[in-house]
Amino acid sequence: MKAARIVKLNEPLQVQELQTPTPKGTQILVKVQSVGVCHSDVHVWEGYYEGIGGQPLKTTDRGVKYPLTPGHEIAGIVEGLGEQVEGFSKNERVLIYPWIGEGLCPACRIGEENLCDKPRSLGIYTDGGYAQYVLVPSYKYLVKIGNDMDTDTGAPLACAGLTSYGAVKNANLKPDDNVVIVGTGGLGLMAIQLAKAITGAKIIAMDIDDQKLDVAKKNGADITINSKKEDPVKAIMELTDKLGADAVIDFVNASKTVETDMQFLRRRARLVLVGLFGGELKLSLVMMPTRAYKIIGSYTGTISDMIELISLARRGVIKPVVSNRFKLEQATEALTMLKDGKILGRGVINP
């Protein structure tokens, strides 16, 4: 099989010919139809996140090993089954839950494998979906999507959709709330769709790209703010009668965006941090108790969340915005375009 692999950090991925795995026991071999291109893939390709004081937080320090086949938003067709697999048949169309844990830690024991102490996530800690086939360790990580869901729009549900869903749930939005969505890429757009459909909150979308904000408006944002062209703090305070936002979901999560977020939080507001751009933040410790802020880290979601999300997608409540499609040989181009902010919504590779 062919796979696009990270052999050297920040260098073009190499399309290599590898032996196609043979599934055993509970394993399932999936023929990849679509794999989403995610900012996490970019970080794994570059080999670092931005840490404190501008120092890089290396992916190898987090347990990532190279060479690696990236890609964790994977939809495809069951190709082969181990002898212990139950409930699945060859040629069934599936979405893979990639946030796999070792199964024994406290998080895994309550179904939160995405927060495992020793993660084995596909495309990050083990080979993922930038390939013609991917080996999944157990059939329990597969969810059937039937023939009514397109794999290009289904694949991003495994991360972009799941992460957005988890963030919206963590924001605990009420119908009269004002929520600011910071960053209107693939995740932000799905968060807007979800918040619009299931919360009734007033949605303020914030970005520095007018084109992305136009797409956000079409996907349900009530108000858009270009923070490069106007003062976002002044704009949001005016929109909220000088009270501030009830919740902020930051899909960028860089030092500059979070510093700005802190200036327009209402008392008792929830600040949900999702993005992985990183950096550091100085906090007024007095303001934390006196204004009773809640700062919440939100990382992907559970397989139960993904099943709920697929149901919402089937009902037309949400639909990932897929704007770019690539061949496997164009994997480096896809990552570069995403890094440079040239993909509106989600890019998908079709191996």
Predicted regions and their residues:
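Residues located in well-ordered beta-strands
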Residues: 2, 14, 31, 75-77, ...
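Short, well-ordered coil/turn residues at beta-beta hairpins
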Residues: 34, 97, 249-251, 351
